[in-house]
């Protein structure tokens, strides 16, 4: 039950950097609005509960959280946010899944298509790459705090799929249907995750050369800078020399 996903490691590093950007507030507020469409009580709505936790992690003010919930439930105007997934290709034929939350579908699809095309990629048809990814619950734990054996002991009993070596952290992968049970098992054991998310995990990754890797990272950055883009997933793996340059 081991492996190493450098791409996933980059995602987590970028996630920590994202918290410093003003976009983080917009991103978590939109997720709360969408989640609250399923009910405004976080006790009964696990997605809303996770969205509120993510909002608190980036210090979104309490009144902003409450406003976003009310927009989602329809108590306030401004809840017309649509959740969509675009599929396409980046440089080197790398598969991309792009999750967006938008109040204007036409604007967003045009912007995402432009970013992909400008980067040497292309927008694809629905279903063209989605089959290459599996939806997983992902719980990330710091290596300095927990061993792989600790996490496996708790996770396997609760129903986790795998424990992945992410470099400076462990990632526990869970089938979405078991996500709440596995999260609860770790919480009851006093084992605290750095992050908890539902992610589209590539079934296989493609290692790319340094030049292609840099192009792909620029594409990821351009997509993530778009206000409507919530998450970006891709199936490439970065060579060590590219990672070393990123550490400089």
UniProtKB/Swiss-Prot annotation:
> In which family does this protein belong, per the annotation?
Belongs to the TACO1 family.
- GO cellular component entries: cytosol
Entry keyword Phosphoprotein: no
- Swiss-Prot/TrEMBL keywords: Cytoplasm, DNA-binding, Transcription, Transcription regulation
Disordered, as annotated region: 1-22
The entry lists its GO molecular-function terms as: DNA binding
The cross-references to Pfam families, in alphabetical order and at most eight, read: TACO1_YebC_N (PF20772), Transcrip_reg (PF01709)
Q: What InterPro entries does the record point to?
A: Integrase-like_N, TACO1_YebC-like_2nd/3rd_dom, TACO1_YebC_N, Transcrip_reg_TACO1-like, Transcrip_reg_TACO1-like_dom3, YebC-like
- What are the Basic residues biased-composition ranges? 1-15
Query: What is the name listed in the Swiss-Prot or TrEMBL entry for this protein?
Result: Probable transcriptional regulatory protein Dde_2325
Localisation per UniProt entry: Cytoplasm
GO terms, biological process: regulation of DNA-templated transcription
Task: State the species of origin.
Answer: Oleidesulfovibrio alaskensis (strain ATCC BAA-1058 / DSM 17464 / G20)
